[in-house]
Amino acid sequence: MTLKDLRIGESAKITAVGGEGALRQHFLDMGVVPGAEIKLMKLAPMGDPMEFRIHGYELTLRLADAEKIEADPIACETVCPKPAADAGKSGEKQEDQDRRGRKKEARAAAKSHHPGLGEGGIYHVKTDGKPLPEGTTLTFALAGNQNCGKTTLFNQLTGANQHVGNFPGVTVDRKDGVIRGHDNTLVTDLPGIYSMSPYTSEEIVTRQFLLDDKPKGIINIVDATNIERNLYLTMQLMELDIPMVLALNMMDEVRENGGTIRVNEMEEALGIPVIPISAAKNEGISELIDHAIHVAQYQEKPGRADFCDPQDHNGAVHRCLHGIMHLIEDHAAKAGIPVRFAASKLAEGDQMILQQLELEENEKEMLRHIICQMEEERGMDQAAAIADMRFAFIQQICGATVVKPHESKEHARSVKIDQILTGKYTAIPAFVGIMGLVFWLTFGVIGAWLSGLLDMGISALTELTDAGLTAYGINPVVHSLIINGIFEGVGSVLSFLPIIVTLFFFLSILEDSGYMARVAFVMDKLLRKIGLSGRSIVPMLIGFGCTVPGVMASRTLPSERDRKMTILLTPFMSCSAKLPIYGFFSAAFFPGKSALVMIILYFTGILVGILFALIARGAVFKGEPVPFVMELPNYRMPGAKNVGQLLWEKAKDFLERAFTVIFLATIVIWCLQTFDTRLNVVTDSQDSLLAMLAGVIAPVFAPLGFGDWRISTALITGFMAKESVVATLTVLTEGISITSLLTPLSAAALLVFCLLYTPCVAAITSIKRELGGKWAALVVVMQCVIAWLCAFAVYTIGGLL
């Protein structure tokens, strides 16, 4: 049978893993290995994909992928033996005894003292040794799985001392920061990954950074509540032979659930410092920093890199790895790749490492012979054998050092919440309700109220400044520039800052809580109908906040096809920068119905995006989306510090644009509107330079009902930044009501055009970095054409009604 044949609640033992290439390796890296026990938890509301529990965590697979994995069913008696008729009470007593035993063992382990610096041991202060030269910058790589608290730890380590950039040659985000109180350090926050296999761009970037940049130390953060899954990456990092510390995050949750980890024993077994921490509560951070700096300063490398049992299957894997190490030792040294890491990667079939080593043909033949012999003795193919070796070691370590609770409160809570949020009949209504609530609170309650308060403050400041300049008797031209150009232009945009921050606040909560992963699970089958994976929903939802991070979020998609298609769809998701446009026109033409107008616009963008995807799938992006293999983390309350820092970054970015791009745009527009070709001040704006330039393209918009040159000018400046549309119109319509330029129908057509036409320069630049100049140019032309056609349809059909 295959995993596809399992029913909900049934368990099985995996016997064979199908598939090929990088996908199959990804299955193995996620713990889907022969011999592993797996249980079907549920199906998505539409019947596909499936949610399994394996190695203590939830994993999603599509039916088509589950069909590639063979398994033997585990009888119910094996999984949950039925108690005898008279054994009910004794069974309850036994469960109570087990629970008390776990708590007693946890208390005993919690009392075990973890030695700090200066208390002896290889990882502690010593008087001898050869430390790095004084003044050397201690560079660290912060590595870990997704959803393990890595961002929280990075913020705790560095505070505000962060710099955001990109890794060389690629578009994956890179964050660097200096550890607080240690100016000679530099921490690089690597992307969250599950293994060092080249499946996603993040994994490739992480591997190349560690191999090429060779940091002085690695801080490996793991989720202590899901330690079996996380230690798989730890083992591969240890093979790099770089000084390393292991940060056991969320230890507070482990203790609260009656479990523990015997840190000292794990430290001894792994041969690296193991530090229990809680990044969210700032517990154990100072000890982690002390140990990290110490191992980096003294270059104390992991004391263990050999994880295979010499007795397992007559040492088949052990002999294979050591044979490969002996074969490639010189080549690995020449290529600058740690020999143990290179050997294990060759053993599992990593072609990128094979190319880097530049082996001779006879050496390649010998390598194939060594691997074939191992496969024959082990009874598994090479990739499965190496993955099995790693998980066998992890089970051995965890069995000796980890006291697990029967079920964590976080997991039990997540199961209950998922009954509604991923339930067969409740998931989609819940999603619509949650997103509707977010938009309602943002546009109709919290954001709108705060925006009104800020607008009142800006208006008061404008009046005060106006009165002061008038009393001072400043030159009328300068007076007009300051009040009509800068204050009214920039101020009209600034008043929408609360709405934008409010939207990002809710989106960050949905993402950090773990709900976005559930949305991907729920929507996968629906998105497959338009040629996308469920993972694509996350970048598109982020696109509601801003197209730039939405485009960047597509980097996590393993398929180039899915990534391109998702990037092209993201601009159809109305970004928060367009909110000032919607608010400005809906307040003028549809008073009292602003929230309804905005919601209609958002759903219009989604609908047009779906239609575009269906056409693109049949014409350009033929084929099927990549497999849906994803971990579903437990629900967690987002950290206030992380959310606050994100909001500050978004607010700062908005303010920087308001006082740079928009500020300059308003000044340029004011100058063009104020002067004629001879630089004389005009009394009628229709005689201005701006009117002359905008008049050239105004006829293009005449069939849409907004052929006025002032509207055309505003749309052009909107290409710089969407917020500039309102700022420009505010400057150009001084003393004129916007209702005199447009009718409600033409305003509706204009809103649709603004919804769909080309994204701002920042978004186009981001698309260019991701896909190249041709695709970026295509997006500009394509979005303008689609926007024109849709606006024309609205204006024409509306005129017939």
Show which residues each predicted segment covers.
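Conserved G1/Walker A P-loop phosphate-binding module
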Residues: 107, 111-195
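Conserved C-terminal guanine-recognition region of P-loop GTPase G domains, centered on the G4
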Residues: 182, 207-274, 581
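Alpha-helical transmembrane helix bundles of large polytopic membrane transport and channel proteins
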Residues: 245, 255-406
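Extended, low-charge hydrophobic alpha-helical regions
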Residues: 377, 384-385, 404, 445-486, ...
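Core alpha-helical transmembrane segments of integral membrane proteins
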Residues: 421-521
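Hydrophobic core segments of alpha-helical transmembrane domains in multi-pass membrane transport
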Residues: 430-441, 503-508, 586-588, 601-616, ...
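Juxtamembrane inter-helical linkers in multi-pass membrane proteins
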Residues: 456, 460-464, 517-547, 622-646, ...
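Transmembrane helix-loop junctions at the membrane interface of multipass transporters and ion channels
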Residues: 576-599, 762-772, 793-801
